[in-house]
Structures are given as structure tokens and as C-alpha cells.
């Protein structure tokens, strides 16, 4: 169940791996245990009590969103639609458009495949937790067949939008902001993995990282979250759910879920931030469609790292920073689960890299500049060669291919 809390959602490409798609690939037979699912409740009995949440009436949310008018839609998908609305900051009652607190109201389709269980997980997790890097759930509505969630409005939308949109009117995220977003998201995951919470997020990806007005990252979409293992258990066995390109290989193979599964997903997103490429893009040449597989050989070679780095980031980082981010990404992506860092370690590494960026101020030495020019020259030649080949056969050149990372289907 995805969260689309910004006015920028409509800018997403129709081919994107969105937060609205189905995520379940079903049972893996003997390799994974199925999750026992209780019947969907028709009362608030299964909702954990939380003083932080308000139980809204359907009429209140209808008024707050101007009767769910089409021009209030922020986004839509398999779960239903997200509407923009306004409520009074103190009373939390509906207010006139443009006044009070801006909210995002997610309205679940009554016959939507994402269903009540994910809605319930969202309410219970976000209702119990409060952290600056988790999106704030203000309240919910459970009335008759209506299922709605009320969130704080995130004015800058998702990381996915900022990282992959192209065009004359869109400014790419700077290196400094990418580090800030990565660190904020890492802190959110570290909080979930802490001994006090013990939650496995299970769907960490760019579309689930939302940004406030100051580009502070907040994790959204807790419909797939699971309680972590307890006692002497090392993992949770469950059906494999998530998004292709982000799920850890051992989780795909066995259905065994651990916090290190989230660490792998973080490594993928860190690589997306570094490269400006999507985790999976079927519109790229066959050898470049899977970002992790394509990038790994370059990341282990200091002289080839610049072939992976987003060429829109010229002169914004030092060689030392680039190498450290590449190394951290590789550590998160290793197939040896025990060798992956925990998220607290990741936070420490990113804080160090961020301090390097602040100290260096974007200045590079002569070696950095020489290697950058060489890398840019290689990239430019490849782009021009590709352009010439496509033009020669009379095909349309797509400067910015549609993304194609997809959810895990049955």
C-alpha cells in the first residue's frame, strides 16, 4: 500500500515502479512459510490504541477534501486515490481550502487488492511510532466499508520524482542534498531496526522516501512492514513481497526476512542516488538494465567509479567522498549477509561522508578533475554513438527512458 503525499505525484512516468502496484509474488512453496491472515475486521477492535491518532468520520474527511473532488487528487493507484485537504491545526476539524493544516487523505478502494490488512498495518505501525524520519500519520477513518488514512502533507514529494524526472524545468538533486536524503532515510531505518522497535520495513525504495520542504527524508508506506524476529530466532519466514530490483537475493530465494534485507534495499537506493539511474530500467541496453549488476564491477575499481556517478553532479563532490559512498553501497549489497553493516553503522558512515563534504566544500584536487574529465569524455562518446545509431535507423530517440522497475507479482 503506497503513500503518495505530494502534489508532484502526477509527474511520475506511467512506466515507473510506483508505490501503487501489487507487491505480492505469493508463496514460495517449501522454501517459505505463508503468513496466517486473520479475517478483516469491521470494527476498530484490531487497531492498537494510540493517543497520537484521531478517528475521523467519513463526513469530516469528505468536507476536508471538498467532497473528494477530482482536482484535489494528488495521486492514484491500486489502493485507490490520495486527496489533498485542509483541517484546523488545533481541533483537527475540516477547514476552508487554503487555511489551516494541509493534509493528504488516502482513500482505499473497497475492492482494492491491497486491502484491509495493509491498511491496518499502516495504522498500527505509524500510530505507535513517532520519529522525525517517519511520515506522520494524523488519523484514520474506519466507517462501514470506508478505509481512509490521514497524513501530513509532504510538499516536495518523493525521492523518486526528484531523482529521475528529466527536463528543462527540473533541477537535479545536488550531491549535498543526496547525502542529506540518504542520511535521513538511514536514520529512519535505524530507528525501525533498534531494539526498542524491532521492525523490518520490507519495502525500502525511492518512491517510499518522501521529502518535506527542507528535503528531510521521511519513510512512508508501512503496509508491508513486519515485526522482527524475537528470542533466539534469526529471521521471520513469510511470503516474498516487495519490488523487483530492491529485494535482497536471500529473501527472494528463501522467504527469510531480517533487518539485513532492509540494508540490502538501502544499498540499492544509495546506488540510485549515486548514479541517477533506476534499480531496474528495461529501456536501457541489456547489460545495463539491472543497476546493481551493471555497477558493481565499476564500484570496485577506484579509476572507474566515475562511470557510475551521475554526470549531472559535476564538481560537487571529491574523489574521497565518491569512493566512500561507493564502498558503503557495496557493503550493503554484498550477498554475504553477515558482512552487511547494520543501519546504525550506515548512519555513522554517512555522517562522516557528509562532514567531509562540508569540510571540502565541493573543491577537488587536480587528480579528481582529470579523472572527471576523462570519465565525462567516455560518457559523451557513448551517448553520441548511441544517438547516431538510433538516428541512422530512423527510430525516435528517447532522451530520458521510462523507468521499468516492477513490483513482485504472483
Curated annotation (Swiss-Prot):
InterPro entries: Kinase-like_dom_sf, Plant_Ser_Thr_Prot_Kinase, Prot_kinase_dom, Protein_kinase_ATP_BS, Ser-Thr/Tyr_kinase_cat_dom, Ser/Thr_kinase_AS. It is found in: Cell membrane. The modification Phosphoserine is found at residues 207, 237. It comes from the Eukaryota. Expressed in stomatal guard cells of leaves. GO terms for molecular function: ATP binding; protein serine kinase activity; protein serine/threonine kinase activity; protein tyrosine kinase activity. Its EC number is 2.7.11.1. It catalyses: L-seryl-[protein] + ATP = O-phospho-L-seryl-[protein] + ADP + H(+); L-threonyl-[protein] + ATP = O-phospho-L-threonyl-[protein] + ADP + H(+). The modification Phosphotyrosine is found at residues 151, 251. The keyword Lipoprotein applies. Gene3D superfamilies: Phosphorylase Kinase, domain 1 (3.30.200.20), Transferase(Phosphotransferase) domain 1 (1.10.510.10). Residues 11-46 are annotated as: Disordered. Keywords: ATP-binding, Cell membrane, Kinase, Lipoprotein, Membrane, Myristate, Nucleotide-binding, Palmitate, Phosphoprotein, Plant defense, Serine/threonine-protein kinase, Transferase, Tyrosine-protein kinase. Belongs to the protein kinase superfamily. Ser/Thr protein kinase family. Possible bi-functional kinase. In vitro, it exhibits serine/threonine activity. In vivo, can phosphorylate tyrosine residues of limited substrates. May be involved in plant defense signaling. This is Probable serine/threonine-protein kinase PBL9. It comes from Arabidopsis thaliana. The gene is PBL9.
